[in-house]
Amino acid sequence: MELKNVFIHHVYFWLKNADDAEDLNQLIAGLKKLSTVTTIKQFHIGKPAATSRDVIDGSYSVSWFTSFDNKADQDSYQSDPIHLKFIEECSSLWQKVIVYDSIDN
């Protein structure tokens, strides 16, 4: 099913302690709380798939995929107290974050 008329926000997290199950579980729990932001239409919490091709970067720890109806909803998410609390509680867990935002072509 093709997604149309959406704003995609895809975040990749690299944990400081990549082998620490407690840190991983804490990040995932934080993302589950974050999923309650009302402007989020869909979300997915993932880990690297067991695929290996030259073009794949599977070095991240956790991915966070969300969709919004529009940029205004995503902007609202950025300043939502739930999002700010997530950053406050979980930012010490990661060493690197990369965000890819996209809209319809």
Where are these regions (language model features)?
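C-terminal structural segments of small proteins and small subunits
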Residues: 71-92
